[in-house]
Amino acid sequence: MFQLSVQDIHPGEQVGNKEEAIRQIAAALAQAGNVAGGYVDGMLAREQQTSTFLGNGIAIPHGTTDTRDQVLKTGVQVFQFPQGVTWGEGQVAYVAIGIAASSDEHLGLLRQLTHVLSDDSVAEQLKSATTAEELRALLMGEKQSEQLKLDNETMTLDVIASSLVTLQALNAARLKEAGAVDAAFVAKTINDSPMNLGQGIWLNDSAEGNLRSAVAVSRATQAFDVEGEKAALLVTVAMNDEQPIAVLKRLGDLLLNNKADRLLSADAATLLALLTSDDALTDDVLSAEFVVRNEHGLHARPGTMLVNTIKQFNSEITVTNLDGTGKPANGRSLMKVVALGVKKGHRLRFTAQGEDAEQALKAIGDAIAAGLGEGA
């Protein structure tokens, strides 16, 4: 995780246009010892290739691969423009984060930033902040409540089990490892019997020891019998705010519609989608998987190409990094796509729902195969 100093943050700046803003940011990077004088040319050239506007009033100007030799050390300079700077057609940036990084160092930094900035409320606060200290706290996530923890790290599938205790222990351990619960929660959820929701689904929680909101799921390879009742999957909930309620509602909808069997046969990505996305509950969803071959993964430029391809269609489209957290993201949001942390060789699953879903998936596959603007 990169560290951000208040000396690298410049609130209340004012410029006439995007080029002026980029030159000002490049000068700050040079003064801080991050880049040599020629880096500004790469920053301006990058904007000619594709806009570095992420969305939510945020831009991330940075150089091209041709000017990586101008980078002396990795760093950022943050400029806030309260009156806004036109960054492209229909794009107004209120915060520009100038990035200097050689190789693919900037990808980790970018992923950290986008996880914070993808929160719409944080982006709004960045516009109105008045001090460097306040901006730093927002960018480092210090003012952001922790998001619900429900991803590949809190799921255990295909467990050889013949009793609920095995699943209880696995879920409790996952939540403890995630820092979501304390020892009291672990003891309570292992010792107390879970609740039978029906259709092979069981649920447990604890009123004690909830440190952050999280959900753990464990599933047996084969269903087993518990006092005459079917058991195959256990959901354990740690609740520190209202975030888990949406997951429980989706779980309830699956049970009410007698579709809980989907949870018992789905792979990890589909199971996560069923619990975190309302679209996954419908029957008319198409999906396709593609492997990203771009040398540096989905950074801003290929990410923009992917999002622009998706925006050509009316269907609702989500994208899941099967080699990442496994959680689906809105395919129309560059911020959320970049935050997926896609590297070369990662598998992406796209789901599309709508009248042109089939055409959309084909176009996405063709774009990825063609290299998303960086060559196949």
Swiss-Prot record:
Residues 285-375 form the HPr domain. The active site is at 62 (tele-phosphohistidine intermediate), 299 (pros-phosphohistidine intermediate). PROSITE patterns: PTS_EIIA_TYPE_2, PTS_EIIA_TYPE_2_HIS, PTS_HPR_DOM, PTS_HPR_HIS, PTS_HPR_SER. One of its GO terms (molecular function) is protein-phosphocysteine-sugar phosphotransferase activity. The modification Phosphohistidine is found at residues 62, 299. It holds the Pfam family PTS-HPr. One of its GO terms (cellular component) is plasma membrane. CDD domains: PTS-HPr_like (cd00367), PTS_IIA_fru (cd00211). NCBIfam families: PRK11109.1 (NF008319), PTS_HPr_family (TIGR01003). This is Multiphosphoryl transfer protein.
